[in-house]
Amino acid sequence: MAGVGAGQDVPVVLSVLGRPPTGRVPGVLAACDGSDGSLWALDRAMTEAELFGLPLYVLAVVNPAPAGYPPGMAELVQESVETLVESMADGLRRAVATVLRQRVRPFAGEMSLHVVLGNVIEVLLEASARQHTLVVGTRGNGGFARLLLGSVSSAAVHHAACPVLVVPAPPGP
């Protein structure tokens, strides 16, 4: 299996229908929003994928604005969503590159990046039906808040169709 080094580009697959790509081998699905907690979880997801010899699917979700715009506004909103998707894809590439740079050894597995339009929780729960493991981070705000799960990780733990690994943020200074 070819590994992915810090200097290599990983293609981003855009799923505009609000669904993660189907027909793929079950693997480790990592939710990534670019936050420090999600980067920490992504690193752990890379390790899990390597340990099990599974592909790693890194997923970012863009939640489009609600429908029902006045005449003339729909086109502006569509342009905004397209810009947001492009921005999220760039951010996802940067997030993966950051984690790859910080790893002691290069990621020795197969990885693909996916940007999906839809509700974050709904997309993750749907995607979990086809995966070996779902990896998510916590809110990781420190102190008491660090003991609480965010809404996404909480929904994943309670409703995902596969095992869920919730990765707490590393202890801060």
Region spans (language model):
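Acidic, proline/glycine-rich short linear motifs
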Residues: 3-20, 60-91, 173
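Hydrophobic structural packing positions in well-ordered secondary structure
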Residues: 28, 45, 124, 135, ...
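Short glycine/serine/threonine/alanine-rich loop segments
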Residues: 48, 52-55, 109, 133, ...
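Short, flexible loop segments at boundaries between secondary-structure elements
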Residues: 162-173
